[in-house]
């Protein structure tokens, strides 16, 4: 062998520094490593010297001679000098029909005590959204069995919607109604940043314990920021697997706000400058990367997505709420004041909108919905006059008509948590209100 060919072979061999490194510094939220030359987004495995703890982490920052890793778990138990290796499987998770009926964490490790999950297919957690020119037109209704939504804020198959509400207004109950009443053959639920006790409560109370067609991905509030962040992306990857099989998928995530808070923790720890309400720029850049992955793709299935947004102090100008509204195809606002009148779910139809509705409903449905909203708005505008008895019947024919329909409209807006209606039933009820 010539000297030149030997040199060429040696250059082509991976350098030792590319294979493993060591932990050189540990902080409360990240681990500094040296001797490894990773790229941002690489997954590494940290092998503890004391053999009590091994863990995975993601490379979030790279400098000339060192890199910084955010662990999927917590840093306790790791020591300076622990070995660090690049994880060969990268950011891939197992996916398959075996996930149906299971509750898993963001790394697809079972949390339900039902044993190991044996999937043969793998999918990347991070993936580009559907190409704009490959998106299918949204021209089919997507029923969720809720009168207010299907009748007045009709969704389309492949649409992305937000559910905006303050704490304790009924987001979880509404989520459960949507999952339970939806006709979608596959349902993927992401519970991100939830309290631990809320997970079994959601499954038993809102889903009735029936998970046959459902996959639940859980990252509770006590999980690391990286687990909470990637829990959302893992759930979307699972939904994409079923979409790629030609299936229509319901994706529902609670909540975008806690997902954003997880990225805020990561970003601030890396030295990003805080902007509005302490959120670094990476948070606002991350939202479309997640939300735009939902939709309808030509030649494949669809992902119809509902993202809940926790609005602090019912402030709809919150930066996460603002950014989410700009990305999504519609928004459903829950109003705390409506609960005082016994209206559940407390959907504020004046401040809610579905941008797809006109493309998926027929002319009669559209006209009946417009009449309903017009009557509702008139009653709200004249609420004070009506309450103090200052309005004289006959002064305004349109308002008189609205007053005559108030009881029927209130009944339409109310729905029990365990009730569900078909599209045909809802369209009939809406038509009857305008023609009674």
Model feature map: region roles:
Residues 82-84, 91, 98, 111-159, ...:
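P-loop NTPase nucleotide-binding/switch module
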Residues 151-152, 158-436:
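P-loop NTPase catalytic core
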Residues 25, 35, 48, 61, ...:
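Flexible glycine-/small-residue-rich
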Residues 6-9, 87, 144-149, 235, ...:
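Phosphate-interacting basic helix/loop segments used at nucleotide- and nucleic-acid interfaces
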Residues 34-35, 93-97, 115-116, 165, ...:
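Ordered, soluble secondary-structure elements with a strong preference for glycine-centered loop motifs
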Residues 1-102, 107-111:
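N-terminal accessory targeting/assembly segments
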Residues 53, 91-95, 109-116, 133-136, ...:
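Active-site phosphate-binding and catalytic loops of NTP-dependent enzymes
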């Amino acid at each position: 062998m010539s000297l030149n060919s030997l040199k060429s072979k040696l250059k082509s061999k991976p350098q030792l520094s590319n294979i493993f490194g060591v932990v050189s510094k540990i902080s409360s939220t990240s681990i500094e490593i040296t001797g490894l030359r990773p790229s941002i987004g690489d997954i590494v495995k940290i092998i503890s010297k004391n053999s009590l703890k091994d863990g995975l982490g993601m490379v979030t920052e790279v400098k000339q001679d060192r890199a910084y890793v955010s662990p999927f778990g917590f840093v306790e138990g790791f020591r300076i000098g622990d070995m660090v290796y690049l994880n060969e499987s990268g950011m891939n998770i197992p996916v398959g029909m075996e996930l149906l009926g299971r509750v898993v964490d963001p790394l697809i490790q079972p949390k339900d005590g039902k044993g190991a999950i044996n999937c043969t297919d793998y999918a990347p957690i991070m993936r580009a959204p559907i190409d704009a020119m490959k998106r299918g037109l949204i021209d089919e209704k997507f029923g969720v069995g809720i009168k207010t939504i299907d009748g007045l804020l009709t969704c389309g198959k492949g649409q992305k919607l937000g559910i905006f509400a303050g704490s304790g207004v009924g987001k979880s109950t509404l989520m459960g109604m949507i999952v339970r009443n939806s006709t979608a053959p596959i349902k993927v639920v992401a519970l991100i940043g939830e309290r631990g006790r809320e997970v079994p409560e959601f499954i038993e109370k809102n889903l009735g314990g029936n998970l046959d067609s459902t996959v639940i991905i859980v990252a509770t509030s006590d999980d690391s920021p990286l687990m909470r962040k990637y829990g959302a992306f893992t759930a979307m990857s699972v939904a994409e697997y079923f979409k790629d099989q030609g299936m229509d998928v319901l994706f529902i995530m609670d909540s975008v706000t806690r997902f954003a808070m997880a990225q805020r923790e990561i970003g601030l720890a890396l030295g990003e400058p805080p902007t509005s309400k302490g959120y670094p720029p990476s948070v606002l850049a991350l939202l479309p990367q997640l939300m735009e992955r939902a939709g309808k793709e030509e030649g494949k299935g669809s992902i119809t997505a509902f993202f809940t947004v926790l609005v602090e102090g019912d402030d709809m100008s919150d930066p996460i709420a603002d950014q989410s509204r700009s990305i999504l195809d519609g928004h459903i606002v829950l109003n705390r004041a409506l609960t005082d009148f016994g209206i559940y779910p407390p959907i504020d139809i004046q401040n809610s909108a579905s941008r797809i509705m006109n493309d998926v409903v027929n002319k009669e449905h559209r006209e009946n919905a417009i009449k309903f909203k017009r009557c509702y708005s008139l009653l709200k505008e004249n609420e004070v006059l009506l309450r103090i008895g200052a309005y004289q019947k006959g002064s305004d024919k349109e308002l008189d008509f609205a007053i005559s329909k108030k009881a029927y409209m209130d009944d339409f807006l109310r729905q029990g948590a365990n009730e569900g209606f078909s599209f045909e039933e809802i369209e009939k009820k809406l038509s009857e209100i305008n023609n009674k």
